[in-house]
C-alpha cells in the first residue's frame, strides 16, 4: 500500500492537481499515461511487484553479489555420483534416483535464487547484467567449439573415406535417412520456434508508442473511453463502477490508518519534534504548491484510471507473449518427439561403424541443447505466469544491459544458436551426407 503512494503519488499528485484544474480530468490522465510510458522505471510497477524496482532499493555497484544457497552442492555432488556409478564403483538404483532428484532440485533452487537476486535484492546492476550477457556469449562460443570438433571429425572421414568403409560416403551397404520427411519437419519446427520467440521478445521490449495510429495507443484510448463512460454512470443503480471499486481497493481502512499516521507526523514536525526530511511521501496529502486548493478526489480517480488502463494493456500484452512462449515450447517438444521417433526406428545403430557414431553424436548432442533451451524457455514462461514481467517498460532490444529482461535475451540468443547448429546438421548430415 505504501509503495503505491510512494511511487505513484510522490511524482504525480501535484501535476495531476494542476493539470486537472487547467485541462480537465481526461487530458490530465492521458498526460500522465503518456509520460509514464516513456520512463524505464515506471511508477506503477509496485502495483504488481511489491518492493521490486523501487528507487530506494536500486543498486549501483559492479559486484556480482549472490545469496547463500546449497544449489551448487546439490548440483555437483550428484555429478560425482553419476561418474562413480558409470565406472561401477557404486551400484545403487535408489542412490541414482536420489542423485538425479538432487540434481534437478538443485537446478530449480539455483534458478529461483538468481531470480531473487535480480528482482527482490536488486543485485543485477548494469555491470552485473553486462557480465551475465558476456558469460552467455562465451558459453555459446565454447559450445560452437564443441560442435566444430564434431563437424571436423565428420568432414575428415566423409571427404576422404578409406578402404575400410568401401571408399564411399555414406559407407557401402548402409541405409541412411532422406533429407525429406522428419528431418525437414524438424527444420521447419526449429526455425518457426525461433521466429515466434523473437516476436515475443520484440513485443516485450518495444519502444514507447508515440504515433497516433499505433495499435497500442488506439487500444488504450478505447479502454480509457470505456472507463470514463463507466465513471460517468456512477451510482446509477446504487452500484459501484469499475473505477470506484479500484479506488476502494486502494483507499480502504488501511489507507485511512496511513492518513492518520501521516497527520501525526505533520503535527510532530510543526511542533519541532521531527525534522522535515523525516516526512517523506506523507507531505503530499497536506501540502500543495502555489496555494492551490487540492482536489483529492480527482487525483485519486485519475490515478485509479491510470492503473486500470495499464492493467488492461499489460494483460493483453502478456497474453500475446505467453501464447508465443507456449507455441515455442510446443515446437520444441514436437521436435524432441520426432528425434526420439527417428532414433527408435533408425535403420542403423551407434555400433554400425563411423557413420552411426557420428550421426548419433551430432544429433544427440544437439538434441540435448534443445532440451536445455526448452527448460530455459519454460522458466521464462513460468516467470510470465507468476507476474515477474508485469512491467510496462522493460527496456529495448538495444539495451540488453540496462533492461529488465536480460534472462529472456540470453535465452533467445541460446535458442538461435540451437537453430543455426541444426541448419548445419540438416545440410551436412541429412542433405549432403545422404546423396
Curated annotation (Swiss-Prot):
SUPFAM superfamilies: Cytochrome c oxidase subunit III-like. GO terms for cellular component: mitochondrial inner membrane; mitochondrion. It is a multi-pass membrane protein. The chain crosses the membrane at residues 70-90, 96-116, 132-152, 176-196, 325-345, 360-380, 412-432. The keyword Transmembrane applies. Its EC number is 7.1.1.9. Keywords: Membrane, Mitochondrion, Mitochondrion inner membrane, Translocase, Transmembrane, Transmembrane helix. It is found in: Mitochondrion inner membrane. GO terms for molecular function: cytochrome-c oxidase activity. The keyword Transmembrane applies. It holds the Pfam family COX3. GO terms for biological process: mitochondrial electron transport, cytochrome c to oxygen. InterPro entries: Cyt_c/ubiquinol_Oxase_su3 (IPR024791), Cyt_c_oxase_su3_dom (IPR033945), Cyt_c_oxidase-like_su3 (IPR000298), Cyt_c_oxidase_su3-like_sf (IPR035973), Cyt_c_oxidase_su3_a-hlx (IPR013833). Its main location: mitochondrion. It catalyses: 4 Fe(II)-[cytochrome c] + O2 + 8 H(+)(in) = 4 Fe(III)-[cytochrome c] + 2 H2O + 4 H(+)(out). Component of the cytochrome c oxidase, the last enzyme in the mitochondrial electron transport chain which drives oxidative phosphorylation. The respiratory chain contains 3 multisubunit complexes succinate dehydrogenase (complex II, CII), ubiquinol-cytochrome c oxidoreductase (cytochrome b-c1 complex, complex III, CIII) and cytochrome c oxidase (complex IV, CIV), that cooperate to transfer electrons derived from NADH and succinate to molecular oxygen, creating an electrochemical gradient over the inner membrane that drives transmembrane transport and the ATP synthase. Belongs to the cytochrome c oxidase subunit 3 family. Component of the cytochrome c oxidase (complex IV, CIV), a multisubunit enzyme composed of a catalytic core of 3 subunits and several supernumerary subunits. The complex exists as a monomer or a dimer and forms supercomplexes (SCs) in the inner mitochondrial membrane with ubiquinol-cytochrome c oxidoreductase (cytochrome b-c1 complex, complex III, CIII). This is Cytochrome c oxidase subunit 3. The gene is cox3.
Amino acid at each position: 500500500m505504501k509503495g503505491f503512494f510512494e511511487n505513484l503519488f510522490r511524482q504525480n499528485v501535484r501535476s495531476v492537481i494542476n493539470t486537472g484544474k487547467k485541462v480537465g480530468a481526461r487530458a490530465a490522465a492521458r498526460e500522465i499515461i503518456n509520460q509514464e510510458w516513456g520512463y524505464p522505471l515506471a511508477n506503477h510497477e509496485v502495483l504488481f511487484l511489491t518492493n521490486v524496482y523501487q528507487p530506494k532499493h536500486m543498486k549501483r555497484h559492479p559486484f556480482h553479489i549472490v545469496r547463500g544457497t546449497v544449489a551448487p552442492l546439490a548440483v555437483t555432488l550428484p555429478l560425482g555420483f553419476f561418474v562413480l556409478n558409470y565406472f561401477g564403483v557404486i551400484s545403487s538404483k535408489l542412490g541414482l534416483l536420489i542423485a538425479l532428484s538432487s540434481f534437478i532440485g538443485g537446478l530449480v533452487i539455483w534458478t529461483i535464487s538468481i531470480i531473487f537476486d535480480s528482482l527482490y535484492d536488486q543485485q543485477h546492476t548494469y555491470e552485473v547484467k553486462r557480465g551475465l550477457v558476456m558469460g552467455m556469449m562465451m558459453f555459446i562460443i565454447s559450445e560452437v567449439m564443441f560442435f566444430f570438433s564434431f563437424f571436423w571429425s565428420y568432414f575428415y572421414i566423409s571427404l576422404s573415406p578409406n578402404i575400410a568403409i568401401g571408399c564411399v560416403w555414406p559407407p557401402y551397404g548402409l541405409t541412411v535417412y532422406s533429407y525429406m520427411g522428419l528431418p525437414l519437419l524438424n527444420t521447419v519446427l526449429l526455425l518457426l520456434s525461433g521466429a515466434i520467440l523473437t516476436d515475443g521478445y520484440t513485443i516485450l521490449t518495444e519502444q514507447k508508442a508515440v504515433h497516433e495510429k499505433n495499435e497500442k495507443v488506439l487500444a488504450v484510448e478505447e479502454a480509457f473511453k470505456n472507463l470514463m463512460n463507466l465513471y460517468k454512470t456512477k451510482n446509477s443503480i446504487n452500484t459501484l463502477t469499475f473505477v470506484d471499486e479500484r479506488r476502494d481497493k486502494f483507499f480502504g481502512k488501511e489507507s485511512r490508518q496511513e492518513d492518520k499516521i501521516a497527520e501525526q507526523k505533520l503535527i510532530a514536525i510543526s511542533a519541532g519534534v521531527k525534522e522535515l526530511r523525516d516526512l517523506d511521501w506523507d507531505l503530499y496529502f497536506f501540502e500543495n504548491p502555489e496555494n492551490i486548493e487540492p482536489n483529492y478526489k480527482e487525483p485519486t480517480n485519475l490515478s485509479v484510471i491510470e492503473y486500470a488502463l495499464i492493467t488492461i494493456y499489460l494483460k493483453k500484452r502478456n497474453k500475446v507473449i505467453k501464447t508465443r512462449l507456449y507455441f515455442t515450447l510446443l515446437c520444441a517438444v514436437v521436435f524432441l518427439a520426432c528425434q526420439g521417433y527417428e532414433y527408435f526406428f533408425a535403420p542403423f545403430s551407434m555400433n554400425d561403424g563411423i557413420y552411426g557414431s557420428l550421426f548419433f553424436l551430432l544429433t544427440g548432442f544437439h538434441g540435448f541443447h534443445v532440451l536445455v533451451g526448452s527448460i530455459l524457455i519454460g522458466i521464462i514462461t513460468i516467470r510470465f505466469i507468476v507476474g515477474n514481467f508485469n512491467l510496462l517498460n522493460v527496456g529495448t532490444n538495444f539495451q540488453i544491459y540496462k533492461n529488465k529482461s536480460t534472462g529472456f535475451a540470453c535465452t533467445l540468443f541460446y535458442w538461435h544458436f540451437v537453430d543455426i547448429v541444426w541448419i548445419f546438421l540438416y545440410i551436412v548430415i541429412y542433405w549432403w551426407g545422404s546423396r
